[in-house]
């Protein structure tokens, strides 16, 4: 990909976002790659949404209606990976698509929660994610 329009959007529920104009935005902006976070959508349902991208990679959380990420693309990536190394719950937080000379990462970073209940986990997630991105940068 020598030139590409890449958009990223935390949609807080892809079905809800479609009802609020996401489809119109996609049609007018015409991105080559669209990264979505907080999709809250099962992979089986995602294929029925009618999003006009021939290459769609969804990573759902184990818990229905929670979290989730996606990379939608006009061009077939060389490879796709979900998640990254480390001890992390199945929350569908990362999709990485490798294109010629470029990695596109759609990530939904965990919140440390009220009273910082998940702060320790968030700090570990951040450290693991930085290491993951550094490995991608070396490729």
What is each residue range found by the language model?
Residues 18-19, 90, 129:
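Amphipathic coiled-coil/heptad-repeat helices and related helical stalk/stem segments
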Residues 40, 45-117:
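Structured beta-strand-rich core segments of catalytic domains in phosphoester-bond hydrolases
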Residues 119-139:
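A long, amphipathic alpha-helix that forms part
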Residues 9-16, 83-84, 121-123:
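Short, flexible loop segments at the rims of nucleotide/cofactor-binding pockets, characterized by
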Residues 1-51, 55, 61-67:
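N-terminal, active-site-proximal structural segment of metallo-dependent hydrolase catalytic domains
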Residues 25, 83, 132:
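Residues that form generic nucleotide/phosphate-binding pockets
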